[in-house]
Amino acid sequence: MKKYYLIVLISFLIFYLSIFLAPYFAYLGETSNFWKFISICLYAVYSLICHQMPQRSFFIFGHKMAVCARCFGIYTGVLVGMIIYPFIKKLDDFKIPNKWYLIIALIPMAVDGTTQLIGLRESFNELRFITGFIAGFTVVFYILPIFFEMIYKKFK
């Protein structure tokens, strides 16, 4: 299982780091068409999974990140959860936690997003990040056991 865990972790780390590469390449693209093209490609890929609204995104290198603040929080939570996962749970333990932990972890993000959507208030990027982080961190403990169990059954 350790081998598969490392493959998943490294793959996700590449995905995560590319969130930072898009604005960095956009910055380099201010003086180079090559880097501008690469950044446009990265933004296009991430546009498939995120709205990328500038007012809901963090900026680095003077350019918005490849995903919005909430998505960035989710992916940061997933990465942190994946890194600490083997310290909390054995990789060959396929039992998932009680569903209520996941529901409770999703409530802050749902409340934040819904209250903004219906116009009760305007959220802010730090809150979007935090609520996304909570959800992303928690979901790891549900998805990885299912994934590892599938791998175990396939290759046992």
From Swiss-Prot:
Keyword annotations for this protein, in alphabetical order, are: Cell membrane, Membrane, Transmembrane, Transmembrane helix
Key word Transmembrane helix present: yes
Cross-referenced Pfam families, in alphabetical order?
DUF2085
TM stretches of this protein:
6-26, 34-54, 68-88, 100-120, 129-149
- Report the subcellular localization: Cell membrane
The record's principal subcellular location, in a coarse class, is membrane
Would the keyword Membrane be found if you checked this record's keyword annotation? yes
Membrane topology listed for this record? Multi-pass membrane protein
- Any single Gene Ontology cellular-component annotation: plasma membrane
This chain belongs to the protein called Uncharacterized protein MJ1492
